[in-house]
Amino acid sequence: MMNHQSMQNGKQGPLEGIKIVEYGVFHAGPGGSAILGDLGAEIIKIESGFGDPERYWTKIADLDMSTPNGESIMHEVSNRNKKGIHLDIKTEQGKTILHRLVEDADVFLTNLRKNTKQKLGIDYESLKKINPRIIHANVSGFGPEGPMDNLGALTPLDRLFPA
């Protein structure tokens, strides 16, 4: 389990007592919850498979993006203030653990695509059955509804499709 250092340094913030379960990749989702952690929220990051792909971004073109110990600076920045768990939510055991985490969470934050969330059972409709008061925060490239609602996006793409 990862446990990145908090920017709070032991100080309480306005979100102290708020529990956020995050299942996100790259920066959009994880970066948002890192800021909420700066404000005192407890963040539990779920990773599956090989982990968040941002873990492996140690070089972009000729730019070295690694820490002195070889880890991704981007991943470190996006995942400060978090506890982490590796969980395969496609298995019954993984689903059971996920449900336990969501039962008493205040927020579930994700940036996965719509069909992926539905397939994994982490869409709002599925999670509200486990915790009716859950806030389902979703970061998406093209919004929750519309002709491109199931497309993923990285920052360069959003410059092509202004709001």
What are these model-derived regions, one by one?
Residues 1-163:
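N-terminal helix-loop segment corresponding to the beta1-alpha1 unit
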